[in-house]
UniProtKB/Swiss-Prot annotation:
The keyword Amino-acid biosynthesis applies. Pathway: Amino-acid biosynthesis; L-tryptophan biosynthesis; L-tryptophan from chorismate: step 1/5. NCBIfam families: PRK06895.1, trpG_papA. This is Putative anthranilate synthase component II. Its EC number is 4.1.3.27. One of its GO terms (biological process) is L-tryptophan biosynthetic process.
Length: 193
């Protein structure tokens, strides 16, 4: 197992890195602007970090996903969540109220391996101004959790090891962040480089 963390220049990225360090998993951090066509080749897992702006501001993420989405285990966080949802055909919308530094309640609604051995409700930290529309959610994806305001908070692909969370598991406001990352890394990737 080897993990590539794509740094989209969010202040939370290195909080995620600190959580990964605790898991004793070999990893590399790569700035998004340095992402090249074959960069992810020798990694089994890819973590797409939070970041500013919207997914389309990062075309290199879409190029990387086009090449590797069927070959790697992928987790998106915040911007990474939005990127994965949009890649598979989801639609973003601008939230009426920006959620920066808000604690909400996550409501798990599936047996997603990401939430294995966790309660069906727990606290999460939100830092976002965009959401993914539930109404026209891509058929190949399953919504696995909402917040207490019914905003999509987590999803998984129906047949590939691809997962994402809108909330920040690395935030001090989020319960079980380390466990969520541990659960993701325990899910077998489709290939083992």
């Amino acid at each position: 197992m080897k993990l590539l963390i794509i740094n989209n220049h969010d202040s939370f990225t290195f909080n995620l890195v600190d959580l990964i360090r605790k898991l004793n998993v070999p990893y590399d951090v790569l700035n998004v602007e340095d992402l090249k066509e074959n960069t992810a080749e020798n990694y089994s897992h890819i973590l797409i970090s939070p970041g500013p702006d919207i997914p389309r501001a990062y075309p290199q993420l879409f190029s990387m996903l086009e090449k590797y989405y069927q070959q790697k285990s992928i987790l998106g966080v915040c911007l990474g969540h939005q990127t994965l949802c949009e890649f598979f055909g989801g639609t973003l919308y601008n939230l009426e109220n920006v959620r920066h530094g808000q604690k909400r309640t996550l409501k798990v609604r599936s047996n997603s391996p990401l939430f294995f051995d966790l309660p069906t409700e727990f606290n999460i930290g939100l830092y976002h101004s965009w959401g993914v529309q539930e109404e026209d959610f891509p058929d190949c994806l399953e919504i696995t959790a909402l917040c207490d305001e019914d905003v999509v908070m987590a999803m998984q692909h129906k047949s590939l090891p691809i997962y994402s969370v809108q909330f920040h598991p690395e935030s001090y406001m989020s319960d079980f962040g380390e466990k969520i990352l541990r659960n993701w890394l325990a899910i077998p990737p489709t290939t083992n480089p």
